[in-house]
Amino acid sequence: MKNAVHFGAGNIGRGFIGKLLADAEVEVTFADVDVPLVDQLSHKQEYKVKVVGTECKIDTVTHVTAVNSASEDVIDRIVKTDLVTTAVGPNVLDIIAKTIAKGIAKRFEAGNDAPLNIIACENMVRGTTHLKGEVYKHLDKSLHAKADELVGFVDSAVDRIVPPAEAANDDPLEVTVESFSEWIVDEQQFKGDIPNIAGMEKTNNLMAFVERKLFTLNTGHCITAYLGCLKGHRTIREAIEDPNIHAEVKQAMQESGEVLIRRYGFDHDMHNAYIEKILGRFANPYLVDEVDRVGRQPIRKLGANDRLVKPLLGTIEYGTENQTLLKGIAAALKYTNDTDPQAVELQTSLKEVGVTKTLAKYTGLAEDSDEVAQIETLYNQL
């Protein structure tokens, strides 16, 4: 395991995946469209990561470079690399798929028959499987069988809070991250040897961990943000230190947790400890994480497979308590942010067609369901 191409040189790319790879002595080439960022990374070939938990420490990440992801350079790197990773955001996966497909085709053309593994590290369920579908659309059909044999598309679950850099910091490459991190990969999807990277955990039951993170960290995070916005709090820490919000977020995570316990057999006490750990992470005094960063793109977050509605569907499936999850969805409908196109679209829909039709459109819940009626009642009370 010698080198990797990582798409996305943003905060998560540099502060999480890129750092773990570099710490494992992998030479990392970042690929990004941000020209000044690429220029600085390729010039300096190192950057600082401020790791904040009970104490602060600054690590220097070395042996890195960068190329423009819209250039031929990145395709040439894919020809020779051992690993491709991404942290670009779910919406950008479809855009980079064409580049990855070109890289795979050129790799085969060059006679490189070494296995290649690709891991999308995104906040989405089975993100790499989605990426594979997009890559294959751009890959000549005659190469599909060979790609099936030699290219592993490895799904993963990732968890680390990486807020935007503080504006006062004069080093544009420095990134702040929390000390907690979790990167879990599906060991059944690799081709060839599984790379040994400290901090990358292997499992044969990925969905349990994907949903544990989605239903706990992501569900709790966005409900903290939406309830915080309604109370006028600016940051996640301010919001979670509000006793009423703390109690409701904890209750929401316990409601979604009951689904996980029934579905995957998680231990009740251990899952409650996991919830407490996440509440502690939200209150990290060193992380300035604004509610608007966590609350943005509410339409995506209200999707049937995302952090609010998916756990709700689980409570319906198992017949368990869901009152606070319903309130979280109602709070999401109240989210306003003029700089976020999805928030604007959501508010426009509420004005034009009302709560019931808006919920049906974006969540997939039936207009005549009890849940939609309850959410509407809660919405009117907020």
From Swiss-Prot:
GO terms for biological process: mannitol catabolic process. GO terms for molecular function: mannitol-1-phosphate 5-dehydrogenase activity. PROSITE patterns: MANNITOL_DHGENASE. Keywords: NAD, Oxidoreductase. Belongs to the mannitol dehydrogenase family. GO terms for cellular component: cytosol. This is Mannitol-1-phosphate 5-dehydrogenase. It comes from Vibrio parahaemolyticus serotype O3:K6 (strain RIMD 2210633). NCBIfam families: PRK02318.1-2, PRK02318.1-3, PRK02318.2-2, PRK02318.2-5. NAD(+) binds at A4, V5, H6, F7, G8, A9, G10, N11, I12, G13, R14, G15. InterPro entries: 6-PGluconate_DH-like_C_sf, 6PGD_dom2, Mannitol_1_phos_5_DH, Mannitol_DH, Mannitol_DH_C, Mannitol_DH_CS, Mannitol_DH_N, NAD(P)-bd_dom_sf. The gene is mtlD. It catalyses: D-mannitol 1-phosphate + NAD(+) = beta-D-fructose 6-phosphate + NADH + H(+). Its EC number is 1.1.1.17. It is an enzyme of class 1 (oxidoreductase). The lineage of its organism: Bacteria, Pseudomonadati, Pseudomonadota, Gammaproteobacteria, Vibrionales.
